[in-house]
Curated annotation (Swiss-Prot):
This is Large ribosomal subunit protein bL21. The keyword Ribosomal protein applies. PANTHER family: 50S RIBOSOMAL PROTEIN L21, LARGE RIBOSOMAL SUBUNIT PROTEIN BL21M. Keywords: Ribonucleoprotein, Ribosomal protein, RNA-binding, rRNA-binding. It comes from Clostridium novyi (strain NT).
């Protein structure tokens, strides 16, 4: 059994026991979150596609970690002008473990 869920503007294909990194969610570590935007569910070889979401379906996941991704360095410069700018960005993320799919 698997499901396609949407969170943080991205879509993920998940099964029970999967570990995935999603855009930051406001949840405490070791708490459970419900992902209610389930776009599709495959149960017993039968695919149910929502329009736009599957009614009554949800995915329950446990928050394992809140963290930041590796730093992305942005360096801008203009040649011959002595103009340089160096910026860095670390995107926050939430690490989830899928516990169950309810459909």
């Amino acid at each position: 059994m698997y499901a396609v869920v949407q969170t943080g503007g991205k879509q993920y294909r998940v099964q029970e026991g999967d570990v995935l990194f999603v855009e930051k969610l406001n949840a405490e570590v070791d708490s459970n979150v419900e992902l209610t935007e389930v776009l599709a569910v495959n149960k017993d070889g039968k695919l149910v596609v929502g329009a736009p979401v599957v009614e009554g379906a949800k995915v329950v996941a446990k928050v394992l970690k809140q963290g930041k991704a590796k730093k992305v360095v942005v360096f801008k410069y203009k040649p011959k002008k002595d103009s340089r700018k160096k910026n860095g960005h670390r995107q926050p993320y939430t690490k989830l473990q899928i516990e169950r799919i309810e459909a």
